[in-house]
Amino acid sequence: MQIAVLRTGLGVRGNALRAGAVLIALLAAFAPMLASAQVAPAQLDPAQGAPSQALRKVTVVSFGLFGGQDVFRSEATGAAAVVASRFGGDPVVVRFNTRKSRDATIDSLAATLDAVPKRMDPGTDILFLILTSHGSPEGLAVTAGRRSATLTPARLAGMLDRTGVRHKVVIISACYSGVFIPRLASADTLVITAADRNHSSFGCEDKAKWTYFGDAFFNSALRQSETLREAFSIARSLVLTWELRNGFEPSHPQIAGGENVEPLLVARH
């Protein structure tokens, strides 16, 4: 912008008047810019005050709850490793049962989750909980040595509520695991299950390293995806392909909730 100054023969007073006019013109010209600069702070993204993803701590807890088959030990261990490599994990807690040991019980899961808030910021950090087992419409089978029990949706919801951790991702690989969604899923809790509440999931052979869903989601899709939802979409298609090829009724994997969690998680390259 250019401001023209007219020269006249008005002398000193004329010069003063002319200088005043120039000053007024300058103030008028830059007033909009000054006003916008003053309101800029009010337009800042509210998220600027939140910790960046790099500063958020991710805790991974993974339990293989059925001791009668080695596939659940293998899947609990492998799933935790993949999640930690993609999103970070500090700490990573893995427990599983075998035909003789009883490391992954309902009580030990409760104790592990109770200890989580001591090692993270419950308001900003993120908890991944991975559970793999056989399932029923009532919940997850917990078989430790000769002892058997059922982890119900209500019991698990109570454990998670007691942690006070806001941002959670719960991934359950089991038949009928969709039964957990109504009690667990919310804007702050993303829930991913291997099946809906009415169907079985497949692939739990004793010598296998993964179930169908575990292989598709953790071992395949999550290794190459930027987000959990993208990984889920890929895994769901893979699982359906394998089920139809083998003549199984589709398990219908589910994803629900997590609107406040997903933006905080982008996989590492």
Give the ranges of each region predicted by the language model:
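Structural recognition of the beta-strand scaffold that forms the well-ordered cores
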Residues: 59-62, 92-96, 127-131, 168-172, ...
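A short, glycine/acidic-enriched catalytic loop
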Residues: 133-163
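Active-site-proximal C-terminal subdomain of hydrolase catalytic domains
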Residues: 174-262
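Solvent-exposed loop/turn segments at secondary-structure junctions
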Residues: 66-70, 98-102, 133-138, 147, ...
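Bacterial N-terminal signal peptides
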Residues: 20-32
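Boundary/activation segment at the start of structured domains
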Residues: 2-4, 11, 30, 35-124, ...
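Bacterial N-terminal signal peptides that target proteins for export
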Residues: 4-23
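Extracytoplasmic/secreted proteins, especially bacterial periplasmic and envelope-associated proteins
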Residues: 74-78, 82, 104, 108-115, ...
